[in-house]
Amino acid sequence: MLTQLKTYPKLLKHYEEIKEVHMRDWFFKDKERASRYFLQFESLSLDYSKNRLNDTTLKLLFELANDCSLKEKIEAMFKGEKINTTEKRAVLHTALRSLNDTEILLDNMEVLKSIRSVLKRMRAFSDSVRSGKRLGYTNQVITDIVNIGIGGSDLGALMVCTALKRYAHPRLKMHFVSNVDGTQILDVLEKLNPASTLFIVASKTFSTQETLTNALTARKWFVERSGDEKHIAKHFVAVSTNKEAVQQFGIDEHNMFEFWDFVGGRYSLWSAIGLSIMIYLGKKNFNALLKGAYLMDEHFRNAPFESNLPVLMGLIGVWYINFFQSKSHLIAPYDQYLRHFPKFIQQLDMESNGKRISKKGEIIPYDTCPVVWGDMGINAQHAFFQLLHQGTHLIPIDFIASLDKKPNAKGHHEILFSNVLAQAQAFMKGKSYEEALGELLFKGLDKDEAKDLAHHRVFFGNRPSNILLLEKISPSNIGALVALYEHKVFVQGVIWDINSFDQWGVELGKELAVPILQELEGHKSNAYFDSSTKHLIELYKNYNQ
């Protein structure tokens, strides 16, 4: 456990020594701080100079990583050891994008051979849709693709397709359906022509309640309009491992794309779950996405900790969570194309590390994953940055931006990028009472009024942030960015001694929903309901009589 590691008390002592130091003093004394705390990898760079740390902090954090045998645990993941201990599974999302030819054997399965076989089928299918060779039941080309999934079968593909919209096939429109409330699927179907629509049903077991409910609604809509169930074969494909259930649905087994237990849902966009990405962006861009992630994998696996982006970001996060007692972490992308990135990272981070039981089954006596949240930065400035600047919470921030200007939008990117730099500087530097008072007096305010108002215009500063810069929003850079966060999450899981690759926390609510649903549908259940739940069931039934 973290608190039992030999470096932990050293970090506690060091924290007490520097907790009151203001970052602006470090910048004033060290003119090289910005260049020393800056890393470049391919087309992605990290400025971590605006963090409450110094050389001693980093030295101790790297010692902490060594205490946990982080290097050995990284290797164990890449080699296919069963590090998902509660489910006795390997964790090989990295193999999905590997350009290495050294085969990985897992329970007599040739992992890379299996992955590349599915990728080959995905490329052929994608080409047939994009080229117009694959036609609908009236011989129309496909114009709309509907991805039906939830969680990891939705968020990754949604995020990537949105981020890389500029690379999409001009004929194709992407739609994503995850919510089971009925509104989302009906709103999407309302816009579509069944004769030119392709549905991708993404569910590993082909039994996920929300996904199957939406898929059956789409199937009913399609059959009613096409007039014949046999047309399903041309318009529905599945990403699943349950061949029997897929065939019962009416989908041809040749239109089923497989993935495996060694790929967790939140790590699955690189697999057949990414079929919608490949069709929308094309195999060349999908390959570039995989390559960007692979290069980050190699960097994570081989770079020294001192220059290793995922290791640094993971350790800096631990520094705030376990020493500064930070409870929350903000993701602030300054790019419209990255608008779904915060909620993708929410799942990646919180479903992986939102746990309080160690690998040995013991209750952990320290904080683990923070609440991860965010929005597009420029909008967030006019919404909740007030709390970040002058509130009572210490909330580290990841600013994410690109250097590349948008065509035909003169002046826009300069305004956007200036705000990234200004906000990061403001969070670090702040504004003292004396500075605020001087500004007000210079504007001509009465001295007594200025003295009173100045208190409200003080920014303490010393609020930490990372600035992640991409040269441009491209397939390879998005691949690298996602892999960076995947590995950051892994690093923190190792430090906290938790299994980052199970998700038992999603199970209990699903189990309890079964008897409640029986009651709502008019059937008697033998389950026990607390008085609140029982009252609300009756309220629903009475309203809908």
Swiss-Prot record:
InterPro entries per UniProt: G6P_Isomerase, G6P_Isomerase_C, Phosphoglucose_isomerase_CS, SIS_dom_sf, SIS_PGI_1, SIS_PGI_2
Active site per UniProt: 351, 382, 510
Keyword hit for NADP: no
Entry keyword set: Cytoplasm, Gluconeogenesis, Glycolysis, Isomerase
Superkingdom per UniProt: Bacteria
PROSITE patterns: P_GLUCOSE_ISOMERASE_1 (PS00765), P_GLUCOSE_ISOMERASE_2 (PS00174), P_GLUCOSE_ISOMERASE_3 (PS51463)
Name used for this protein in its record: Glucose-6-phosphate isomerase
Organism: Helicobacter pylori (strain ATCC 700392 / 26695) (Campylobacter pylori)
Gene this protein is translated from: pgi
